From Swiss-Prot:
Any matching Pfam family: WAP
Cystine connections: 34-62, 41-66, 49-61, 55-70, 81-109, 88-113, 96-108, 102-117
Top-level taxon of the source organism: Eukaryota
Name of the featured protein: WAP four-disulfide core domain protein 5
Record GO terms (molecular function): serine-type endopeptidase inhibitor activity
One CC-aspect GO term: extracellular space
Known function: Putative acid-stable proteinase inhibitor.
Subcellular compartments: Secreted
Record-linked Gene3D superfamilies: Elafin-like (4.10.75.10)
Coarse class of the protein's main subcellular location: secreted
Underlying gene: WFDC5
Ranges where the WAP domain occurs: 27-73, 74-121
The keyword Lyase belongs to this UniProt entry's keyword annotation: no
Amino acid sequence: MRTQSLLLLGALLAVGSQLPAVFGRKKGEKSGGCPPDDGPCLLSVPDQCVEDSQCPLTRKCCYRACFRQCVPRVSVKLGSCPEDQLRCLSPMNHLCHKDSDCSGKKRCCHSACGRDCRDPARG
C-alpha cells in the first residue's frame, strides 16, 4: 500500500510540474516566442493583429518592425537574458538572431552593440 501511495505521489508531482508550461499561457496564446525586434521605429504603422488567435497555425502575433504582425514562432530557451551594463562605442553585426542559433542553454540576447549568445541570468 505504501509503495502504491509513493508511486501515485510521484506521478502527481510529475504531472503537476508540467502544468505551468501548459496553463501558464493565456487562452489562444500559442507556444513558442517572438523573434527579437530590432527597433527603434521611425514610422507609425497600424497593427495587423492583436493576439495569436488571429494568426495562421504556425505564426504568432508579435511586435516586429514597429507594429504587431503575424510572424513565424521561434523556440525560446529557459531563463532570461542578463542585463547589459555596458555602453556601445562601435555597433557590430548580430552574432545570433534567435535562441536556436546558440549552443546548449545559451540564449540570443540583446547586448550594448548587437545580439550575441549568452548564458541565461541566474535567479
